[in-house]
Amino acid sequence: MTTQTSAATGSPTQQNNAALADMDSMDRQLLDIIQTGFPLSPRPYAELGQRLGLDEQEVLDRVRGLKARKIIRRLGANFQSAKLGFVSTLCAAKVPQDKMDAFVAEVNAKPGVTHNYLREHDYNIWFTLISPSREETQAILDGITQATGVPILNLPATKLFKIRVDFRMDNDS
């Protein structure tokens, strides 16, 4: 949950900039494509390879390398949960340092948690939760509070303004 930094490794921003600088044009093109147009086919990596002039194994190796370097954190579908009948909420909690690990573990164990962030603020943990109903959301949050002793501020979404972001990696594509 927390980010460790040392003088030897640099700040997280410096680490990210170094990782981006190490990517070649092909990695950048691959990232551009898989963010918005990952093929839904029996052999998606072969299809990506055809678009990029690579073979299937080269694409797989590049994706694995990007994951190993933590440039790709997750590769999977994103669903519009509201269209599937689910509700979402933003949650905040004031978590004392001595309860941090237990609280984070409890939150992260819930399948509906999509993001979980440590912030420098009185409300130092912020996470998003998706569930089938407001009642189930509240039951999940009550369970976390009961298990950890930390109350949670529940801020249900009332209107969606933006749901996606694409990071353009290759200016030539």
Curated annotation (Swiss-Prot):
Pathway(s) served: Porphyrin-containing compound metabolism; protoheme biosynthesis
Keywords: Heme biosynthesis, Lyase
A Pfam family hit: AsnC_trans_reg2
Known catalytic reactions: siroheme + 2 H(+) = 12,18-didecarboxysiroheme + 2 CO2
The keyword Phosphoprotein appears for this protein: no
EC number: 4.1.1.111
GO molecular function terms noted in the UniProt entry: lyase activity
Catalytic EC class: lyase
Gene Ontology biological process terms in this record: heme biosynthetic process
Binding-site positions, substrate: 115, 119
Similarity-based family: Belongs to the Ahb/Nir family.
Subunit structure and binding partners: Forms a heterodimer composed of AhbA and AhbB.
Function recorded in the entry: Involved in siroheme-dependent heme b biosynthesis. Catalyzes the decarboxylation of siroheme into didecarboxysiroheme. Siroheme is decarboxylated to monodecarboxysiroheme, which is in turn decarboxylated to didecarboxysiroheme.
Name of the protein in question: Siroheme decarboxylase alpha subunit
Organism annotation: Desulfovibrio desulfuricans (strain ATCC 27774 / DSM 6949 / MB)
